[in-house]
Amino acid sequence: MSWFEALILGIVQGLTEYLPVSSSGHLAIGSALFGIEGEENLAFTIVVHVATVFSTLVVLWKEIDWIFRGLFKFQMNAETKYVINILISMIPIGIVGVFFKDTVEQIFGSGLLVVGCMLLLTAALLAFSYYAKPRQKESISMKDAFIIGLAQACAVMPGLSRSGSTIATGLLLGNNKAKLAQFSFLMVIPPILGEALLDVMKMVKGEDVAGDIPALSLAVGFMAAFVSGCVACKWMINIVKKGKLIYFAIYCAIAGLVTIACTLLK
C-alpha cells in the first residue's frame, strides 16, 4: 500500500465512520479498487478505526469530561447511569467479538456483493427512521441501550453502517436526536479499543498483524482518518439534529445498486 492510497482510504474512513454510509463498506470498495486484500487490508482497517476513536475523543471531549467528573463522585447520578448504558450497549458486540471473530473476518473477505446488499439495508433503515413518527424521550433507557447495542453488533457486516444502524434504531425507539448521536459515537470507543488491544497482544506474541504495509502508509492513513473524522463527527451531529438522514438513505441505495451491478457484471 502506497502512502497516497493510505491517504485516500484514511479520508474515506474518517468521513464514513460518522456519516451513515458504512465505513467498512466504503473501505472494502476502496481496497478492491486499489487491489488491497487479506491481512494488509485488515491491519489498515484497525489503524484507521483507532484514529477515528481519537477524533471522537477530541470532538466530544466536553461530554467525556462531564462523564468522568460525575463517575468519580461514586454516586448513582446521571453520569454513572450513562456509563452503565454504554456498558450495556457493549454486550452484543462483545459476544460477537469473542465467539464469532473468525466468522466476521471471513465475511469481510466475502466480496462486494455482500457490501452492496448491506448498503441497501442501510438505506432502508435510514428511510424508516426518517418517516417514523417523532417522539422525544428524556434519556436513553437501559432497554434502549441494549437494543441499540444489538444494532451495533449487526453492523459488523461490511456495508451495514454502524452509525446509521445505531442512530436509526435509536430514533425508531423515540430518543432525542442530539443525545442519540453523541451516545452512538461514544458507545463504539470501547469495542474499537478492545479490538486494538487484541491485535497488540498478537504482535507481542510475534504474529504478523501489519502485513507488508510500510510505517509511512500507516501513519498517513491514521492522520487522514483522524482529521477527516473530526470534521465528519461535528457535521454528523448537526445533520442528525436537523433530521436530514433521508439524503444518506438515497446515497446508500444508489451506492448499493451500483456495487451490486458492477459485481454481477464483472
Swiss-Prot record:
The chain crosses the membrane at residues 41-61, 80-100, 107-127, 140-160, 180-200, 213-233, 245-265. It is a multi-pass membrane protein. It catalyses: di-trans,octa-cis-undecaprenyl diphosphate + H2O = di-trans,octa-cis-undecaprenyl phosphate + phosphate + H(+). The keyword Hydrolase applies. Signal peptide: none annotated. It is found in: Cell inner membrane. GO terms for molecular function: undecaprenyl-diphosphatase activity. Its EC number is 3.6.1.27. Pfam families: BacA (PF02673). One of its GO terms (cellular component) is plasma membrane. Keywords: Antibiotic resistance, Cell inner membrane, Cell membrane, Cell shape, Cell wall biogenesis/degradation, Hydrolase, Membrane, Peptidoglycan synthesis, Transmembrane, Transmembrane helix. One of its GO terms (biological process) is peptidoglycan biosynthetic process. The keyword Phosphoprotein does not apply. It comes from the Bacteria. Bacitracin is thought to be involved in the inhibition of peptidoglycan synthesis by sequestering undecaprenyl diphosphate, thereby reducing the pool of lipid carrier available. Belongs to the UppP family. PANTHER family: UNDECAPRENYL-DIPHOSPHATASE. Catalyzes the dephosphorylation of undecaprenyl diphosphate (UPP). Confers resistance to bacitracin. This is Undecaprenyl-diphosphatase. The gene is uppP.
